[in-house]
Every structure is written in C-alpha cells, then in structure tokens.
C-alpha cells in the first residue's frame, strides 16, 4: 500500500495534471519515476464498452453482456439485482484488463428531453442512491473501480459543456446531491 499523501507531494504539477487529462481516451498517464502505472477505464453503465485506443465508434466495441438500461432496472427497486449486475460487470472488466468502469450514472432526471435519461437510474434521489450503491458494491467487490457520473445537475446533452444549470442551494441539496451522497457513504466509489 502506498502513502498517497507522500506520493502526491512528490508529483510535479505537470504529472498531476496528466493524471486528470489522460494519455488517450481510455487510459490515464503513467508516472514511471514514481511507479504509477497507467489505468485503463471503460464506459459501461449497462455493459462493458471497451474499445481499441484508436476507436471512438461504439459499434466497434468488444462483445460483452448488455444489461437493460438503468431506467428499466430501477423499476425493480431490487438492490440484490443491482449488486449481481455489478458483480458481473466487475468480472468482465477484470477479464478485459479494465481497472475502472465509468458508471453508474447517478445524476437525477430533470427533463424528459435529457439525452442521458436512459442511463440515469431515476428522478428519485432515494432510489438512485440506493441502487447505485448496490451496483458500485458489486463492481468493486471484484477489485474494479467505479466512477459515479455525471456529477450533479448535468441534465442535458445539447451544449452540456457550456450551459448553466441554475437552481437554488435547497434544490441541489434536496434533489441532486442526495443520490451521490448515498452512493459515496454506502459504497465508496473509487472516483467521482
């Protein structure tokens, strides 16, 4: 086990930024001098979507189990089902050398027009938090990390990098943050 604080203090600003930006779409940058390897991440809220480094076309992904969309599995309100789904995804990630699965999508559904509603668990913060925690616990039980996304109030695809989600602090605290808080407290995802 590494002393993380010591390791970070030994990194240059450029090395820290490199870990945030990545070597390519699916790998973090490695830091050879400190023994930090690259990490392969892969999309996959509903199944592993691993692609070659040079491939961006989702139709060129490896063959993998495809689960129903989160909005469908959430209808079951079955924590054990989500745990089992997570375990299966964790096993597939290990078989394909994927270290971190980019999911689950925990953000709350705000509009029926949101382009990511299919992958968001629910418009209900309690349901989204409980089921995402089970999913995360399943994946991470196989020593594969998860990355809960798309952090708080990212509720549209059109101009999503430049739009503003204006709301009161009360709305953030009562509707958007609770699902993330539950997931973090009950499952401790490796990344947010």
Briefly describe each language-model feature range:
Residues 1-192:
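Glycoside hydrolase catalytic-domain context in secreted enzymes
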């Amino acid at each position: 086990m590494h002393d993380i604080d010591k390791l970070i203090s030994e990194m240059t600003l450029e090395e820290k930024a490199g870990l945030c930006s990545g070597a390519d779409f699916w790998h973090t940058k490695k830091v050879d001098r400190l023994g930090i390897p690259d990490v392969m991440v892969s999309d996959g809220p509903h199944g592993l979507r691993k692609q070659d480094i040079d491939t961006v076309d989702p139709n060129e992904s490896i063959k993998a189990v495809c689960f129903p969309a989160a909005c469908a599995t959430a209808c079951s309100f079955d924590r054990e089902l989500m745990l089992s789904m997570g375990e299966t995804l964790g096993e597939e990630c290990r078989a394909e050398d994927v270290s971190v699965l980019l999911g689950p999508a925990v953000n709350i559904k705000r509009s029926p027009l949101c382009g990511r509603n299919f992958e968001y668990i629910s418009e209900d913060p309690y349901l989204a938090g409980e089921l995402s925690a089970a999913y995360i616990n399943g994946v991470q039980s196989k020593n594969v990390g998860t990355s809960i996304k798309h952090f708080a109030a990212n509720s549209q695809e059109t101009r999503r990098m430049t739009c503003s989600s204006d709301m009161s602090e009360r709305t953030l605290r009562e509707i958007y943050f609770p699902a993330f808080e539950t997931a973090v407290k009950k499952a401790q995802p490796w990344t947010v």
